[in-house]
């Protein structure tokens, strides 16, 4: 499938705008673990995911990561083109969680179309509002929800995404997603194991009591 099949508002663009986007959209393939954009890069461009999975995260002064959101097929990343938004200074890192194919559109190209199209401008604002809502929700979870509940919710989300109850994931990776230390994750996972909710092995977490994790997450 080509670019036009993935861009959500393609049919609302003028033929000229469609030609500009198609001509300037560069298809790029990256391996799992590749850092596509980080806060020190001036402007990577707008990203449109064709297949795979991307993770957006921030780094603390101590180098600790915390995931903000993830991007899947047909999702668009604007923060990698933050130079389009003069009032937003957001040092964010975008990393491939899986082998990913995506289109990269230069900020200049997209900004040109956004300035002449109210449809594109409104669409962009909707994406921005959604991302900020996700970040605000995450901050509320970190501030007000206990870690055991957050971890239960994370494990259930991973099971849903990977479509399996046996997660191939390390404690270090979980810690990076959740913005905490590996030791904290390990202690809580061992508690979950003692309670019969999970089974731990090297590099894997098996969900044994999905219902109990859901109840814990919901309380």
Question: Where are the predicted features?
Answer:
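Polybasic "coupling" helices that flank or enter modular domains
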Residues: 97-99, 115-180
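Phosphate-/nucleic-acid-contacting segments
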Residues: 147, 156-219
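Cyclic-nucleotide recognition modules
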Residues: 69-125
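Cyclic nucleotide-binding regulatory module and flanking cytosolic helices
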Residues: 1-31, 71, 76, 81-85
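Short phosphate-coordinating micro-motif centered on Lys-Gly-acidic
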Residues: 36-41
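Glycine- and acidic-residue-biased ligand/ion/polar-headgroup-sensing regions
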Residues: 33, 44-57, 72-74
């Amino acid at each position: 499938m080509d670019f036009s099949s993935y861009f959500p508002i393609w049919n609302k663009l003028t033929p000229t705008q469609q030609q500009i986007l198609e001509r300037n959209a560069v298809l790029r393939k990256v391996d799992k673990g590749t850092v596509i954009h980080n806060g020190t890069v001036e402007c990577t461009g707008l990203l449109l995911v064709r297949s795979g999975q991307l993770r957006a995260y921030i780094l603390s002064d101590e180098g600790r990561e915390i995931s903000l959101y993830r991007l899947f097929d047909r999702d668009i990343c604007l923060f990698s083109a933050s130079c389009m938004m003069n009032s937003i200074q957001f040092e964010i890192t975008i990393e491939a969680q899986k082998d990913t194919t995506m289109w990269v559109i230069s900020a200049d190209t997209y900004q040109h179309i956004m300035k002449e199209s109210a449809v594109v401008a409104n669409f962009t604002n909707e994406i921005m509002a959604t991302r900020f809502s996700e970040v605000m929700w995450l901050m509320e979870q970190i501030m007000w929800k206990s870690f055991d509940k957050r971890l239960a919710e994370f494990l259930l989300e991973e099971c849903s995404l990977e479509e399996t109850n046996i997660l191939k994931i390390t404690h270090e990776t979980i810690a990076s997603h959740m913005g905490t230390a590996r030791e904290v994750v390990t202690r809580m996972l061992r508690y979950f194991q003692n309670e019969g909710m999970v089974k731990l092995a090297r590099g894997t977490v098996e969900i044994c009591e999905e219902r109990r994790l859901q109840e814990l997450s919901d309380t």
